[in-house]
Structures are given as structure tokens and as C-alpha cells.
Amino acid sequence: MNSLYTAEGVMDKHSLWQRYVPLVRHEALRLQVRLPASVELDDLLQAGGIGLLNAVERYDALQGTAFTTYAVQRIRGAMLDELRSRDWVPRSVRRNAREVAQAIGQLEQELGRNATETEVAERLGIDIADYRQMLLDTNNSQLFSYDEWREEHGDSIELVTDDHQRENPLQQLLDSNLRQRVMEAIETLPEREKLVLTLYYQEELNLKEIGAVLEVGESRVSQLHSQAIKRLRTKLGKL
């Protein structure tokens, strides 16, 4: 780490930039796989580069936050801001996501337990196949919850990444009270949905690998993930 400081003990911003440029590509590739093919990698890289530049310029080691943690916030946030500015998610998909979350919340409040897919589909007035397709569509749009957290809770609650661990938008929240609520809410999820979140965010398995564990296809894993995120949103909204 000494190479990042000048002889006078001042952080060398140029060296910091050079060392962490690969992080921009890493985050861009992780994000791109969850986005429509129309989203270009170069656009994400450009936005992420601006985010890294902001991180280099604004980082204050005295605040006690590791630079990697801070940089990931800035890089990923810049990429999401770019996506948001283009409004790439169709309004119908946003509307469906809200309707699904609302139906789940209403049912679980009425039933006092986790609602089944069939029950949610019936509440929405659609068949199970259409409901599962809706889950797929909304899962592709929600950026695995990061953007949804920012929309609901604002920039005052940031997602953070440990230096040695993949970014985890469900558990690593700066606000300790909210983190505890998230963990408690995850424990109440149906076992398969809880397992999907654990395998993806903690064990770092991809959708294909998770599908092999559950003996289902990737699309089914995506549906389970989408439903789990929506359950968490409704559960956290009641806490």
C-alpha cells in the first residue's frame, strides 16, 4: 500500500487510479450480465470510470472506510445513474414489479405466512405461467435489488463491499439496524428462495450452478430470486 503514497505521505491519486482501474471492468461485467443486450459494455465502463475518478478525488482515509469499499460504491452508483438516465426499463415492467410486490404484501398480511406462487397469480388474475414470466421480466430489470434500495431508501443508505468479498446488496448495509432487519427477513423466506440468495450472494454461484444444486433451469432460479427480492421488500416495509 506504500506505493500509493508520495514521499511526503500524501496519497498518490494517479497510482490509486491505475491500481483500481480493473475494478471498473469487473463491476461492469458483473452488471452487464443482468441487463438487456442493448446495454453496451463500453457505456458501463465509461460511467464506471467517472465513478472511480470521483472516488479517487473525494476519498478520505480518515473516515475509516477502505478505498475498495468506497470505490465500488462510486463505480456502481455511477453505472446505475447512467442506466437510470436512459430509463431502459419499460414502464410496463416497472408497473408489474410494483403490482407483484403489492400482491405479495397484501396476501402475506392476510394469511400470516409466505404466499405461494399460485396464490399470488390468482390475486393478480393471471395464470401461473404468466406470473412466472412476469417474475423473469422484473428480475432482469431490478439489477438484483441495488437500484431498488436506492429508490426506496435514498442515497443516505449505501450498499458497501468488503475488500475480500463480492458485493452483497442484501446483507452489507451501512445502517446496522437495517442490516439486522434484512437478515431477520431473509430467515422468514421459503427455504428454496432463501437458498437461492445464500448460494448467489454468499457462495458466489451463478444461476446455472444454482440451478444444478436445485435441479431446475436457470430461468426458474431467476424467478425464485425475483420473488425472494419482492418478499424482502414487503417484509422490510412492515418493519
From Swiss-Prot:
It comes from the Bacteria. Residues 16-88 are annotated as: Sigma-70 factor domain-2. One of its GO terms (cellular component) is cytosolic DNA-directed RNA polymerase complex. Changing residue 81 to A: Loss of activity. Gene3D superfamilies: 1.10.1740.10, 1.20.140.160. InterPro entries: RNA_pol_sigma-70_dom, RNA_pol_sigma70, RNA_pol_sigma70_r2, RNA_pol_sigma70_r3, RNA_pol_sigma70_r4, RNA_pol_sigma_FliA_WhiG, RNA_pol_sigma_r2, RNA_pol_sigma_r3/r4-like. Keywords: Cytoplasm, DNA-binding, Sigma factor, Transcription, Transcription regulation. A motif (Interaction with polymerase core subunit RpoC) lies at residues 43-46. Disruption phenotype: Mutants have poor biofilms (decrease in biomass, surface coverage and mean thickness). It is found in: Cytoplasm. Residues 96-166 are annotated as: Sigma-70 factor domain-3. Sigma factors are initiation factors that promote the attachment of RNA polymerase to specific initiation sites and are then released. This sigma factor controls the expression of flagella-related genes. The distinguishing feature of FliA promoters is a long -10 region (GCCGATAA). The upstream GC constitutes an extended -10 motif and is recognized by Arg-91. HAMAP family: Sigma70_FliA. This is RNA polymerase sigma factor FliA. It comes from Escherichia coli (strain K12). The gene is fliA.
